[in-house]
Amino acid sequence: MLPFTNMSGDAEQDYFADGVTEDIITGLSRFRELFVIARNSSFTFKGQSVKVQDIGSELGVRYVIEGSVRKMSSRIRITAQLIEAASGNHLWAERYDREIEDIFAIQDEVTETVVATLAGRLGDLGVDYAKRKPTHSLTAFDYVLHARQLIYRYERESILEARELLEKAIALDPEYATAHSWLSEAYWAEWLGGWTVIADASFEKSTQAAAKAVVLDDTDPQVRIQMGQLCLNRRQYDEARSHFDKALSLNPNEPNGSMMYSYYSTCIGDSERAVAQINEAIRVDPLGHYGYMAGMAHYTARNYDQAIAAFKIVRGEAQSGLAWLAACHAQSGGLAEARAAAAEFVARATKAMADMSVPPPSSWRAFFAERHPYKHQDDMDHLLDGLSKAGLE
C-alpha cells in the first residue's frame, strides 16, 4: 500500500495522510491470507512517480493500493484504488466524501473492500477488528497521528514533542489504548537512547503506559510488542515470549513483531531462530532497516563476518551500532578497525549527549550491559569482552 497523497494544500497535513495510510496497512496486515508489505518499505516511494509494475517487481507483490486524502475543515475526501501490479489494471476504485467524524468508518471500508476483492470473504478476526472504534475524540486521534510521525524520527526533540501530544490525547480520552501505547514507545526511546538524566524514571513511565494500554486493549499487536520488549529488559523472558507470540498471532505481517522476536531469541541464546526471525522481518519489509538486529544475532552466534557486514549498513544511522561494530572487529582480530570504530562511537555519542545536556555514562560496558538483557552470562561476557578489546570500558 503506497502512502496516500496529501491533497489538502498544506504540507503540515502530511502526517494525517500518512497516519490514515498506516492504519489501513495495519488493518490489512491482520489477515493471514494476505502478504502485506510494511510501512517502512512502502513509504520509501512517498512523493515519487514510479510505475506500479516496477513497485510490484521491487517489493514482490501482486497488487498495489494508492490514493489520496483531502482534509477540509469538518469534511474529508479519500480516494483509493486497488491495482494489479503486473498489468496496471484497476480492480477497484472508490471515492469517500464524508464528515471528518467518519474517518474510522472509511478506513474500515477500504480494508474490508480490499480483502473482499482479493480473498472473497472476511475472517471473524477481521470483522471484529474492523468494527472497533479506537477513540471517541477526533482531536485525540489527530494528536496520535502527529505524535507517531515524530517518534519515527527517533530524535530527542521530536520524542519530547510527541510525548506532549500523547499526553494531550490521553487527557481527551483516557481510555485511548493506542495513545498509551505510543506514550510508552516515546519513553522507551528516551530510555534506550540515553536521552534522560534519570533513566530509571523513563523506563518506569514506559512500563506504566504499556501496562495501561494492555488493560484497555489486549488485542493490539503494537501494545503486545511494547510490553514484550519491556519484559525482556526486566529479564522476564517467559512473559516477553508470551507477548511476542501474541503479537504475531494477532498480526503475522508485523515486521516489528518478528524483529523483536529475533532480539528475544538473541538474548536467550537461540541464534538460529534469531536469524530466521530477522529474515522474516526483512521478507515483509524488504526496504526496512534491520541491520542492527541482524548484526546482534550474528555477533552472538560468533558469525563475525556477517555481523560486521550488518553493522556497516547501519553505521550512519545508529551510533551504538559503531560500538557493536568495534566489538565485532575486535573479536575477529581486526584491532585497528575495532579501535577506529570505538573512537568514532565515543566521539559521536559524547557529542550527542552533550547537545542534550546529558552526561556520558561512567562506563560504556555498563551502559550496554543494562540495555542488552542476555539470559546467559557467557553471552554477556562475550559482548563485554569485545567492547573491552576495542577499548571501550
What are these regions (language model features)?
Residues 2-310, 321, 328-332:
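Acidic, proline/glycine-rich low-complexity intrinsically disordered segments
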Residues 29, 56-57, 312-315, 346, ...:
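Alpha-helix boundary recognition
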Residues 130-133, 196-197, 351-371:
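Acidic, Ser/Thr-rich low-complexity linear motifs
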Residues 206, 315-319, 330-353:
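TPR/TPR-like (Sel1-like) alpha-helical repeat modules
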Residues 292, 321-323, 365-369:
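Short beta-alpha connecting loops at secondary-structure transitions
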Residues 359-393:
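Terminal, low-structured helical/coil segments at or just beyond the last alpha-helical repeat
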